[in-house]
């Protein structure tokens, strides 16, 4: 059967964290089928195209008629007077040395630089143009109408909405606004980097809701210029929310260059939290949003992943990008939008404060060294301090991590990602097509069992051949396909492309992957201590904390690792991956957490499956090894050198084979994104000096030698 991309394996809308935000007595809406926004104009929007399949579409001037007939009923007041007269801005002006008149003029300039100027007429025109753009770029643009109904109900409460999408493509800026217009929701004010405020185009973005923020501020700030700028920006966000207008910004701060969620930044979310804490607004809804693309319109960021600096946006570059994107029809394939359940910020503040406070005493002291592992006991990236109270910075980090985790976990998986995952983690060479198709079905079932959803896949119904056929059309540049065999093309760009797609799958199996890697790094048949597996898995999580979000702030990572080992798939007495040394005594009761004892891998088939899971994260551990070994070698400069130059040099030398390694590196492990995160974690743990910002020099730290030795142990396949 062909892929039914509008179907879904998830039949109920739910909050992924029902520990923090239980639904209580609410009736959970059922999710029906996704609807295609590109079809709305053909049916005049109402009823939805899926309601009456017998109705034939009316294509004559459909987009034009629909765009002008759907009203923009909401009001978007100008907040300039409110911002410039706010207490926050006046307080900053009164502190500065220059005359008040000069500072007031500067404040007006900053407001003009930042503010959106939303125009209903321009939005109407753009809504029509975007129909043409999206039809060219996409096969379908799918949303869940039940999710939109939940958003509509939340908006009717009068509490402002804050949309927090993951960031994959520049198209992300357009999708929420366009989707909200279809469903009669308010159009958001969208935080955009000032790099997009281009001559001749900035006004158009402002007219559709964009407000621009500086990507960098002056760290010296002798004249208080940036202090005033921050006050204007902060007050602008407060005033927009106080007028019940929604805001949209990307917690990650920038587009993901490698296909996975980034750790959140604290900037704009801290302004929203402060506005609620200080009572400027009573509350707001936080709405996680994510997107599933078969391919992003910009393509893979290959040059940036090789350490080549990003070219700053320009008007000419925009037109080049448009021409490149339009040169191939349906480049993005099927695109899905996912909206999480709106949660009030006050609920986040209450539940996360309670969770972090109650769990604090059970967390081990940071940097408690293990004798046989190569890191530390717990991953607490949102909890850097050890005071008895939860400070504001910790709270803001926790909220950011919680929202991004929710967004990544509700994201559907593209068939392109499923195929890419198998090509890299299981079959890196030639494999028969029939075997590969069966494995596609197997992996889709695993994703569904983990609570995920694969676009177009219906459990026990969809054939792997349909998935493979669909995905290969999008991967023709990096996969060799015949009627009998499948294999990836042997080039760095091909493996990077496949890795970009594969990385969206890892969040479903991240904890399983690190556990599997600790197991397969030991010789076959070796007795495995459960305590040691857990400690080594936590160590790997710690070292990969800037690559993946393994759990929510309210979760205990240690408990989750134990729970995975206790799952039926792992501990079933007959079919589990692991066999207890005392199974005959009734030790294993599949489904409960395992806390002690010794285990063995059951058989060769179980080890093969564990090897697949381990290979999901192996490239990232290899990247950490490559960076660690490079910064202690003679190839690394002795004087502080910019991180970008270090990374670019390492990429070039690794691909040229100029670096001696005890293993053959996976080509996808050679990329700037993973190297940056590796440098970041080495500096975070004090293994590299931070004397010069964004720079690295050769290190003689003895702890690096210990790390390298232990990484070699983990990366060795036995």
From Swiss-Prot:
GO terms for biological process: CDP-diacylglycerol biosynthetic process; glycerophospholipid metabolic process; triglyceride biosynthetic process. CDD domains: LPLAT_DHAPAT-like. It holds the Pfam family Acyltransferase. Keywords: Acyltransferase, Lipid biosynthesis, Lipid metabolism, Membrane, Mitochondrion, Phospholipid biosynthesis, Phospholipid metabolism, Transferase, Transit peptide, Transmembrane, Transmembrane helix. A motif (HXXXXD motif) lies at residues 167-172. It is a single-pass membrane protein. GO terms for cellular component: mitochondrial membrane; mitochondrion; plasma membrane. The chain crosses the membrane at residues 409-425. Disulfide bonds: none annotated. It catalyses: sn-glycerol 3-phosphate + an acyl-CoA = a 1-acyl-sn-glycero-3-phosphate + CoA. InterPro entries: GPAT/DHAPAT (IPR022284), GPAT/DHAPAT_C (IPR045520), GPAT/DHAPAT_LPLAT (IPR041728), GPAT_PlsB (IPR028354), Plipid/glycerol_acylTrfase (IPR002123). One of its GO terms (molecular function) is glycerol-3-phosphate O-acyltransferase activity. Its EC number is 2.3.1.15. Pathway: Phospholipid metabolism; CDP-diacylglycerol biosynthesis; CDP-diacylglycerol from sn-glycerol 3-phosphate: step 1/3. Its main location: mitochondrion. It is found in: Mitochondrion membrane. It comes from the Eukaryota. Belongs to the GPAT/DAPAT family. The HXXXXD motif is essential for acyltransferase activity and may constitute the binding site for the phosphate moiety of the glycerol-3-phosphate. This is Probable glycerol-3-phosphate acyltransferase, mitochondrial. It comes from Caenorhabditis elegans. The lineage of its organism: Eukaryota, Metazoa, Ecdysozoa, Nematoda, Chromadorea.
């Amino acid at each position: 059967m062909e892929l039914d991309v509008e179907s879904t394996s998830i039949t109920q809308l739910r909050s992924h964290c029902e520990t923090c935000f239980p639904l209580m007595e609410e009736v959970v809406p059922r999710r029906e089928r996704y609807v295609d926004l590109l079809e709305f104009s053909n049916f005049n929007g109402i009823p939805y195209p899926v309601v009456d399949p017998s109705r034939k579409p009316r294509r004559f001037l459909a987009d034009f008629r629909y765009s002008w007939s759907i009203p923009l009923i909401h009001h978007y007041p100008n907040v300039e007077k409110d911002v410039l007269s706010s207490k926050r801005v006046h307080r900053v002006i009164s502190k500065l040395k220059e005359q008040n008149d000069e500072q007031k003029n500067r404040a007006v300039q900053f407001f003009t630089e930042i503010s959106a100027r939303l125009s209903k007429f321009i939005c109407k025109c753009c809504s029509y143009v975007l129909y043409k753009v999206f039809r060219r770029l996409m096969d379908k643009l799918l949303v869940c109408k039940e999710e939109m109904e939940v958003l509509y109900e939340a908006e009717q409460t009068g509490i402002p909405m804050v949309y927090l999408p993951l960031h994959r493509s520049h198209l992300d800026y357009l999708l929420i606004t366009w989707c909200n217009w279809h469903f009669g929701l308010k159009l958001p004010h969208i935080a955009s980097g000032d790099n997009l405020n281009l001559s001749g185009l900035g006004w158009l973005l402002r007219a559709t809701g964009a407000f621009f923020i500086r990507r960098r501020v002056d760290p010296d700030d002798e004249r208080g210029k940036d202090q005033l700028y921050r006050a204007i920006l902060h007050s602008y966000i407060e005033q927009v929310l106080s007028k019940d207008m929604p805001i949209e910004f990307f917690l990650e701060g920038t587009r993901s260059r490698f296909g996975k969620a980034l750790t959140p930044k604290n900037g704009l979310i801290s302004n929203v939290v402060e506005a609620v804490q200080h009572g400027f607004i009573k509350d707001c809804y936080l709405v996680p949003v994510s997107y599933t693309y078969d391919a992003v319109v910009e393509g893979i960021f290959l040059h940036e992943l090789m350490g080549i600096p990003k070219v700053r946006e320009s008007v000419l570059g925009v037109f080049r990008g448009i021409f490149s994107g339009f040169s191939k029809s349906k480049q993005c394939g099927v695109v899905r939008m996912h909206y999480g359940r709106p949660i009030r910020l006050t609920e986040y503040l209450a539940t996360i404060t309670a969770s972090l406070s109650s769990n604090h005493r059970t967390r081990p002291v940071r940097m408690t060294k293990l004798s046989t592992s190569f890191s530390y006991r717990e991953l607490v990236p949102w909890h850097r301090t050890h005071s008895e109270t939860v400070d504001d910075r910790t709270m803001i980090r926790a909220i950011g991590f919680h929202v991004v985790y929710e967004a990544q976990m509700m994201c559907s998986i593209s068939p392109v990602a499923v195929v890419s995952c198998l090509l890299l983690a299981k079959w890196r060479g030639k494999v028969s097509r029939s075997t590969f198709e069966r494995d596609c079905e197997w992996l889709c079932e695993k994703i569904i069992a983990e609570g995920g959803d694969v676009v177009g896949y219906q459990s026990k119904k969809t054939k792997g051949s349909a998935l493979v056929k669909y995905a290969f059309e999008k991967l023709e540049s990096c996969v060799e396909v015949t009627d009998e065999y499948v294999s990836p093309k042997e080039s760095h760009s091909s493996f990077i492309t496949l890795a970009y797609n594969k990385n969206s799958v890892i969040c479903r199996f991240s904890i399983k992957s690190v556990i599997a890697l600790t197991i397969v790094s030991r010789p076959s048949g070796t007795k495995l201590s459960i305590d040691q597996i857990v400690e080594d898995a936590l160590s790997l999580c710690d070292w990969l904390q800037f690559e993946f979000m393994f759990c929510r702030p309210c979760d205990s990572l240690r408990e989750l690792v134990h729970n995975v080992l206790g799952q039926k798939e792992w501990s079933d007495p007959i079919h589990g991956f692991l066999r207890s040394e005392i199974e005959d005594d009734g030790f294993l009761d599949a489904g409960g957490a395992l806390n002690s004892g010794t285990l063995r891998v059951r058989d060769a088939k179980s080890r093969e499956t564990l090897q697949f899971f381990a290979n999901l994260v192996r490239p990232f551990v290899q990247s950490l090894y490559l960076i660690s070994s490079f910064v202690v070698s003679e190839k690394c400069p002795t004087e502080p050198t910019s991180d970008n130059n270090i990374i670019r040099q390492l990429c070039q030398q690794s691909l040229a084979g100029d670096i001696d390694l005890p293993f053959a590196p996976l080509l996808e492990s050679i990329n700037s994104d993973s190297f940056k995160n590796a440098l970041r974690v080495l500096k975070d743990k004090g293994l590299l000096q931070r004397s010069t910002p964004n720079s690295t020099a050769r290190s003689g730290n003895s702890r690096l030698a210990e790390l390298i030795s232990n990484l070699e142990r983990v990366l060795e396949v036995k």
